[in-house]
């Protein structure tokens, strides 16, 4: 059971990681060459990063310039707010170096996803989930090394219907940008969970 999974392929090997919540070590890593048989090969972090407290959710792989990035959600020790951190390694199964928070925005910033467009890196996230206002899926340009925000965050989509959007993925194909995201309630006999596209 790997909630909030993220998968990448490097050469002929697939790597998957996902939410570990409060369980240490943090963010398990599994590998496969056929997408059927998987073997756990380690974790992103053996110990929690210095700035974090709990709620280790939704890690997102990204491979850029021969470097493996993982953007992850965790609660910050100093204020108990969920933010997005980033760590890098030369390999998905190698030792990751944590670079601390990359998105510290409002009362919640979760569910990172990376888009590369015309050589520039962008990060998207869910915001305002704990505020008395509609959730928004926000984005911002990243520095070329992928470790810091640059420029002003901008809105991708606003949840005016209050459907609980989160877990967004965005990509570009044939000149169009697509945003895929989860809405409605998850789990149980009355679940109305759905996936939407914009």
What are the functions of these language-model segments?
Residues 1-198:
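Carbohydrate-active catalytic/glycan-binding domains of CAZyme proteins
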């Amino acid at each position: 059971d790997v909630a909030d999974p993220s998968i990448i392929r490097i050469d002929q090997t697939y790597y998957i990681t996902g939410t570990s919540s409060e369980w240490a070590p943090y963010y398990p890593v599994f590998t496969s060459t056929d997408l059927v048989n998987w073997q756990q090969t380690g974790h992103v972090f053996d110990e929690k990063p210095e700035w974090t407290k709990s709620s280790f959710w939704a890690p997102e792989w990204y491979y850029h310039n021969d470097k493996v990035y993982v953007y992850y959600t965790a609660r910050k020790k100093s204020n108990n707010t969920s933010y997005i951190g980033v760590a890098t390694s030369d390999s998905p199964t190698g030792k990751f170096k944590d670079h601390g928070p990359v998105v510290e925005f409002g009362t919640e910033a979760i569910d990172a996803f990376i888009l590369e467009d015309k050589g520039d890196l962008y990060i998207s996230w869910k915001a305002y989930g704990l505020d008395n206002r509609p959730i928004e899926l926000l984005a911002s340009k990243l520095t070329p090394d992928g470790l810091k925000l640059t420029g002003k965050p901008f809105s991708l989509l606003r949840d005016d219907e209050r459907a609980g959007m989160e877990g967004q993925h965005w990509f570009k194909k044939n000149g169009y940008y697509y945003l895929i995201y989860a809405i409605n309630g998850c789990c149980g006999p009355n679940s109305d969970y759905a996936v939407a596209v914009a």
